[in-house]
Amino acid sequence: LGRFSFCCEIAFSGEVWMIAAMKRMLLVLTTILTILSVLAEKTLDIYWVDVEGGAATLMVTPAGQSILIDTGNPGTRDAGRIHEVATQQAGLKKIDFLITTHFHGDHFGGAAPLSQLMPIGKVYDNGIPVRNPDRNRKDPAFILKVKPYKTMKVDGRVVVKPGATLPLEQTGGAAKVGLTFIAGARKFIDAPKGAKKNPHAGTVPSMKEDLSDNANSVASLVTLGGFRFLDCGDLTWNMEAKLVEPVNRVGTVDVYQVNHHGLATSNNPLLIKSVAPTVSVMNNGHTKGCTPSAFAALQDTKSIRAMYQVHRNLRTDGEKNNTANEYIANLTKPQECKAFTMKLSVTSDGKSYTVFNPRNKHRRTFKTRKH
C-alpha cells in the first residue's frame, strides 16, 4: 500500500509539474503573440474608401494618428462609409487631420456629415473661398453648399503652404513618418538644391488653361522611411507638369493615387513617367474616370507593376480600359455595389508594402524602391 501511495504521489507530482510547465509555455506564447501583435500594428495603413467616384483616402500612422484626405460627396452615404472604415476597420475614434484638396462637392461634401459621426481635429485646405472658385464666380449656390463645411465643429483650421508638414507623432520600432504639402493654390514646393533638368521635360504639350478649382488642388507626399506615396487630389494637366518641369520637385514615388479619378484633363504622362511609381490606385466610379488617355498613360509607364481600381469601368470602353478584375475592388453596378475598400499596408521599416483587395482576398507585396 505504501509503495502504491508513493507511486501515486510521484504520478500526481508529475502531472502538477506538466500542468505548471504548460501554463508557463502558454504564458510565453501569449507574451510572444502580444509582442508580435504590437509590432504588427506599427504599419502605415492607407484605405481607399469607396465614395462612388469621389475621393476619401484614409491613413493611419504607426503611432495611431489618422489623416483623411477628402471626404466624398454631400449626404450621409459617403460620410457613413468613411465612418465605418475608420471605426470598424481602422479602429479609430477620431480623425486627427483632415486635408481638403479643393472645393468640389465630391471632395469636401462629406466633411460636415462626418463631423456629426466622429470628432475631427485640424482641417487643412487652401482657405474657404468667399465665392465659387470655378468659372462661375457669381454663383450664389456655392456659398450655401460650403456653409456646413465652414461651420462644422473642428479643433482648428490651417491654410496649406507648400513645403509645410503635418506635426505627426513618431513611435519607437517604426521608421520616421511624414506628410509634406508639395502644392496648393497653384503654388509649389521648391525644387531640391542642385536638381538637374528633368529628361522628360518638354515631351508633352500643355492644355488650355484650367480655370476650375481642380487646378488649385492640394498635393501631398506621404513617407515612411524610404516609402513614398503621392496624392494630388484633382490636380490638372498643366499644374501636374509644373510639379516636374523643368526640374522634378517630387522625385520618384512607390505609389501614385491616380489624379482626378482617372479623368482626361489630368494624368499628364510627363508627371507619371517622372515620378515613376511601382503601383497606381485609381479612386474612380462605375462610369466616372478611367478614361482612355489616363489609362494609356498608366499602361505606358514602364515602372508600374500593378494598377488597382476602386471600381470597374462599366462604360462601353471598359473592355479596353480596365485593369484585371483581380485588381479591382468593386465590379458591379451601383445598386449591387458592396463598397469594398482597397487597403495598403507599409511595414514599420518602410521597406515593403502590401495591397489587399477584400472582395477576392487578393494580396500582393512589393519592395520599396530606392529613390
Regions found by a protein language model. Give the residues of each.
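Bacterial N-terminal signal peptides
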Residues: L26-S37
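Cysteine-centered motifs
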Residues: C7-C8
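Flexible, acidic/histidine-containing loops and adjacent segments that form or flank the divalent-metal
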Residues: E41-L44, F108-T236, S303-K370
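Active-site environment of divalent metal-dependent phosphoester hydrolases
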Residues: A55, G75-T76, F103-G109, P129-P133, ...
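Active-site metal-binding motif and surrounding structural segment of the metallo-beta-lactamase
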Residues: L44, P62-L68, G72-D125, R131, ...
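Conserved beta-strand hairpin/beta-sheet module of binuclear metal-dependent hydrolase folds
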Residues: E41-K94, D213-W237
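Divalent metal-coordination and catalytic microenvironments
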Residues: D50, M59, D70, H102, ...
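Long, structured stretches of catalytic cores involved in phosphate-ester chemistry, encompassing
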Residues: Y124, P129, V244-P334
